[in-house]
Amino acid sequence: MHTESAEPVGFPFTAIEGQPQLQMALLLAAIDPLLGGVLVEGPRGTAKSTSARALAALLPAGRFVNLPLGATEEQLVGSIDLEAALQRSAVQFRAGLLAQAHQGILYVDEVNLLADGLVDLLLDVSASGINRVERDGVSHQHDARITLIGTMNPEEGQLRPQLLDRFGLFVRLENVPSTAMRKAIVKTRMAFDADPRGFFAAHANAQAALAARVAAARGVLVAIQWPDAVHDQVAQLCQDAGVEGVRADLVMLRAARAHAALQGREQVTFVDVQAVAELALAHRRTQGAPQSQEGDEPSPESGGAQTSQPSGQRADQRADQSTDAQQAPPSPQPANAQTWGEMSAPQAVPIQTVKALRPFSSKKA
């Protein structure tokens, strides 16, 4: 558990192959740390941790702090020397991992296995940029503008929906889709392993240019505005996705603003919104809500498209069908019909003659 400085022999961010969505999400979070971090879901070997470490080299401080699963709350937020505070009336604060990660990357591998309380605390700090520590009436706070990156393998469990929604952006990685891409990734990695310094030097110009773009975007971020028409588009996308609350709207607008800043634009455009929409909606879209145009395919379970109707019409149709069913005579079923689970039609049962019963004798035995 320690802070790691970005070394020049680290794998360069600009050399990562086959993960454009992941790279974009990480850059947006680096430009605006208050987005709420990035959650990356995917199988092993899909460049999750490599990308997170490489991002740190693009930031001015270059800090990369790893949060182990066994960390305690005190190790994360820091601690207050209560005795010193009482005796000398001065707060003596011992910095935790959040303070160490200020202006850098705080990375949590297998965040789905981290205690819910720590995840909740991390997300609070990531969204506010401030770490508050309280102990027995003594409090201390400090800036903690961290770029939070959490990764998880879905085979090892899921995050609770309440925590999932609080991550600003979400990227779902798949296995390498083609043999050509596999070859490109392997060749790149082998070239780096053979000569890390030489490989990094070959990408130094691209790295410097991207770092300059990120720094410039961070500098102009707050000056970039979005027109009402863009805000209308964001609201409609979130409404169509059936998301709960307005967190998705806020994240999408902030992410679109960061994207515009990275592209050198002075205001947010529809292009910026489209570039970030799925990153903000993928983990918030409710079941049954329409996907984006590319993903509008019926699921195998649905059996095809279904047409929704107003509830009043459905109720009237059910009533009509019920009346028709009562009036229509039962139709004969073929012998080979699949009628498992159906209830047979009610049959009239004649009243049987009941033999009269002799009353009990009132005399006592």
Label the predicted regions.
Residues 2-23, 241-242:
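Dynamic helix-loop-helix/coil hinge segments at AAA+ ATPase domain boundaries and subdomain interfaces
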Residues 30-69:
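Walker A/P-loop
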Residues 47, 236-239, 244, 258-365:
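C-terminal engagement/docking regions of AAA+ P-loop ATPases
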Residues 72-101:
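Short glycine-rich substrate-engagement loop in P-loop NTPases that contacts/grips substrate
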Residues 72-73, 99-126, 159-164, 181-182:
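Conserved AAA+/SF3 P-loop NTPase catalytic/coupling segment centered on the Walker-B
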